[in-house]
């Protein structure tokens, strides 16, 4: 029984923490880096993106594994809880295909931008800022997926 409690804790903290971190990047970090010159902002965005790419997909997968265990272990006691954990797993995993389907174009555009060009050309600077704002808006959807995953996990933990 104690293993279930441990997995419930991890199953709540992982998606909720990820949701908060993703939302923080969009609402606090992006505006802060956009204060400076565009070439510096681009370098900072690339660093932030590379760090997120190394962690958030794996957190989503780890969350899905934890939720999958909970869904499996709770199926005999409470089918509703089991379904909530399954919903939580799928919701958390949605950040990966969402990124690949809806954000990849913006990511590729930002990664291939020439820092020297965005410093010299006003139109290139405006284009950079437009792309990064669009990326930030889409990033909030990723936060929402993880938040919903956390809520489903909380509901599954409370329901039984």
UniProtKB/Swiss-Prot annotation:
Keyword Membrane carried by entry: yes
Sorted UniProt keywords: Membrane, Mitochondrion, Transmembrane, Transmembrane helix
Source taxon at top rank: Eukaryota
PANTHER family on file: ANTHRONE OXYGENASE ENCC (PTHR35042), DUF1772-DOMAIN-CONTAINING PROTEIN (PTHR35042:SF1)
Name the record gives this protein: Uncharacterized mitochondrial membrane protein C800.14c
Cellular component aspect of the GO annotation: mitochondrial membrane; mitochondrion
UniProt topology in membrane: Multi-pass membrane protein
Localization per Swiss-Prot or TrEMBL: Mitochondrion membrane
Transmembrane feature ranges: 13-35, 55-72, 83-103, 140-160
First-listed, main subcellular location of the protein, grouped into a coarse class: mitochondrion
Family annotation (InterPro entries): Anthrone_oxy
